[in-house]
């Protein structure tokens, strides 16, 4: 297959869903039927091929997205298995960044759950075309049609039903393919590897005709010629329907909906056919956004084998056999072992050593990879998540990823002094792998503080530290990661002068600080940032080479805010004026001046304390509803909605994280163990003044 032609045959897809919707099982079945896995791995037995870290095998949840290559028909499918637990949202986010399409798996019983909404919004952010697989059709309470309604109501999505289930719950035995208008039935005794087509059962003919008409109504809108045929009563061929479903999927005009039961081996092969038929190849995506290093110009780069090499590092993993592995998605050009490329973000050269195609935890050495491929590189020295690797002669920086701020932190200390150095090394390795995990030292106590996206996230980090790096540690109680911000604009003019023999220091800066939400002409790319710096210096009042010093100073000092020492977020700093001295000015002098300007200026901006607010979903039998709502209100919660789901009630509330520690035990006693809950970070909000006073006093 020629390299150029090869791009059309690649599908880079993610399989994403809420925890327990059956995502890993679906991926396992895909690997089984595409011939990559000789034993079906069951998650609940701890044997799934994709869940290859020890903790994942024990907990039955997917933590790191393992990238796997398999083949179906004549296509290469690279699958990224993404975690469904809310604490690992960052893994989902960075997987979506490098994918061309996704399969969203939904639980046929629970429908659209909170994490499903989060993943869907993340996929919207990166414009990822996707289709939906309603799984677990064999389970008690499964309801395909209700799930489709939830796609509309909760996600605002436009579902395109291309299959209907035959039978429900334990009688689920197959599907109706609305494109071919045939029934597909699976043989249980062949582990789902054998299936056959037959005529649609008589009792489902009318329903199939009704949904086929709905399907045609939606797809013919994409092509005037086909619409004319349809309106004249002529037959629209299966090939035309497929072409239009593909067109609509790639343009996100609608989302094809399929169904099945991965665990019972039904519906997986048609899902694979749909991945190949409807999800985009790298050619359909066509371009990747980035910046030309030589000119600083933002532009769209074509995805092509013949262009210069450019790739994005989207994941770092420690492999027990190979050491550090950097997963890259190649957007253009090609690369061979032994080549030297440049990391354009760090401006460091990297020599390509071993290149590996990954199959969960098996690996295959390759000598060459090209546009569209996802490969793992061994032994890179300076590359971290979000960096670009590029051709040395034509350097580009691909669009970077934004990572969320951690919401929870705790102190760790090694159990013995001998472990001190090992712990430092372990934590820095783990932080290099995971940008949503941060490590810092508390300046007052000297303690090491780790920060992450939730209790489970930090639990797993500590677990990995113990297993992989053999470091035993004592753990403090979890603390809320508060933040600070300003609520009104303020201006400060500060001069830093130091004259004490020898070289002097001089720098003057005039900076306007303002809350981000009040900035009128904020650029689109700055809207998700927590700190924006801009220089409006004209006429050389501050020479160009000193301006990075101002930004660096502000970036460092904002980590310790002015109220209680928490990081300062959601503000813009604009350098509007300044002065320098020919001899005494330096980058360092401007860095010091910026820090002092921050310390003096920020208190004038009416600073406030912020706390993380979580979206909490509680599913409870009716009879405990009153007690649960009363308890949420007592935790400063704000009820957002209450909806019936089957014979239970679903309560969604926004509650400060500080009030949610130990909630699992309270809920258990309020509902006699019958209610369950999940929570996900929603946003930061101002802390009420009486609560803020208590927090300040503790600091």
From Swiss-Prot:
GTP binds at residues 17-24, 81-85, 135-138. GO terms for molecular function: GTP binding; GTPase activity; translation elongation factor activity. SUPFAM superfamilies: EF-G C-terminal domain-like (SSF54980), P-loop containing nucleoside triphosphate hydrolases (SSF52540), Ribosomal protein S5 domain 2-like (SSF54211), Translation proteins (SSF50447). InterPro entries: EF-G-like_DII, EFG_II, EFG_III, EFG_III/V, EFG_IV, EFG_V, EFG_V-like, G_TR_CS. Its main location: cytoplasm. Residues 8-283 form the tr-type G domain. GO terms for biological process: ribosome disassembly. The keyword Transmembrane does not apply. It is found in: Cytoplasm. It holds the Pfam family EFG_IV. One of its GO terms (cellular component) is cytoplasm. Belongs to the TRAFAC class translation factor GTPase superfamily. Classic translation factor GTPase family. EF-G/EF-2 subfamily. This is Elongation factor G. It comes from Rickettsia montanensis. The lineage of its organism: Bacteria, Pseudomonadati, Pseudomonadota, Alphaproteobacteria, Rickettsiales. The gene is fusA.
